Amino acid sequence: MAAATPEIQFYERELNIRRVIEECDLQRLDQALNICDLSSVERKLRLWQKLLPRIKPFYAVKCNDDPMVVRLLAQLGAGFDCASKNEVKLVLGFDVSPERIIFANPCRPVSHLEYAKEHQVSNGTVDNEFEVYKLHTHYPNSNLIVRFKSEAKEAQCPLGDKFGCDADVDAAALMLLAKSLELKVTGTSFHVGSGCSELQAYDRAIKKAKNLFKFGALLGYDMDFLDIGGGFPGSDDVKFEKIAESVNTSVQRHFPDERVHIIAEPGRFFVAAACTLVCKIHAKREIRNEAGKLDTVMYYLNDGVYGSFNCILYDHQVVIAEHYLDNAESLPHLKSLIWGPSCDALDKISEDLHLPNLNRGDLLGFRNMGAYTMPIASAFNGFEVPKTLYFQAI
């Protein structure tokens, strides 16, 4: 039996987190609360379409595979970047056509390729000769998109050590190999790194892609597909506007031909700001100095790095705690340290911050928790993952 679709609560104008907290009665809930604003996702899509009208977004499912998010983006016409059979299956379940999916994993198990073939998901990336031979054997009529390496000088999560071939030598060799095997090379792909903060990174990569298109033409390929990857910020619209301006300029310079289909793989851009995590303090410990004066307060929350805060370890995120006290200005602010609930000393959320002297049962909120959080969360030590509530503007 299929799982029931979660309830969506509707709001007018702006989502009031404090009101949500009051109505949920979190004192009775052991789990942390993940508040997901689906309208934030839709607003980001509209912003993308406004600032990057030629580039179709293919949402990176790995970033947040919540079915409610995927369903919304499917309904709004977005494409999808999938890395596995299960991600492809999830997306197809929302009546997304195969043309709206790119299998953007250059190293796929054979069973995943066979699933893609069965469901006519033909666009996929390659960055090594073994994958080319694998496709020749298991999916010879697929569309090969050569992924090359072109990293940003500043990125939250660089990817070049694992994926992407050398753009100057290896990419051409893969195209020659594909030609000899009578496979179709339809385009190129790159990823400057997740959380890119260097404006020039995209222009460098797009220029390399243009050179490969020229080489492909010499081989007789009519390449018409460019994937500029991800890396777009999720919580800084000003920075995104600057990146969009740089990308538009580069695309117009190197790919003025409108027949070339250009896509991107934004993940955190769509979902980072959509989620606010609210945690409850279930324990507290005070540390005093040699003179007996209160020096540091340690708080223990009902979520940690084995849950939503895995983003600290795996995504290099810096999370910012905010309290919901009305009289905080009148309270002393003390050096504070925040721990997760598990028995592991690695389960540290934040340190060297100053908070008012909070008590057991008080709440702390963390914004921008929609990217690379819940998909990786586990119930380590028996602590439940957060409960998610969904909201949407009327």
Swiss-Prot record:
Q: Which residues does the annotation say bind substrate? A: 314-315, 344
Catalytic activity reads: L-ornithine + H(+) = putrescine + CO2
Active-site positions on this chain: 343
Pathway field of the UniProt record reads: Amine and polyamine biosynthesis; putrescine biosynthesis via L-ornithine pathway; putrescine from L-ornithine: step 1/1
Q: What is its EC number?
A: 4.1.1.17
Matching InterPro entries, A to Z?
Ala_racemase/Decarboxylase_C (IPR009006), De-COase2_C (IPR022643), De-COase2_CS (IPR022657), De-COase2_N (IPR022644), De-COase2_pyr-phos_BS (IPR022653), Orn/DAP/Arg_de-COase (IPR000183), Orn_de-COase (IPR002433), PLP-binding_barrel (IPR029066)
Pfam families in alphabetical order: Orn_Arg_deC_N, Orn_DAP_Arg_deC
The terms under GO molecular function for this entry are: ornithine decarboxylase activity
Q: Which family does it belong to?
A: Belongs to the Orn/Lys/Arg decarboxylase class-II family.
Self-association or partners: how does it assemble? Answer: Homodimer. Only the dimer is catalytically active, as the active sites are constructed of residues from both monomers.
Stated name of the protein:
Ornithine decarboxylase 1
Gene (name only) = Odc1
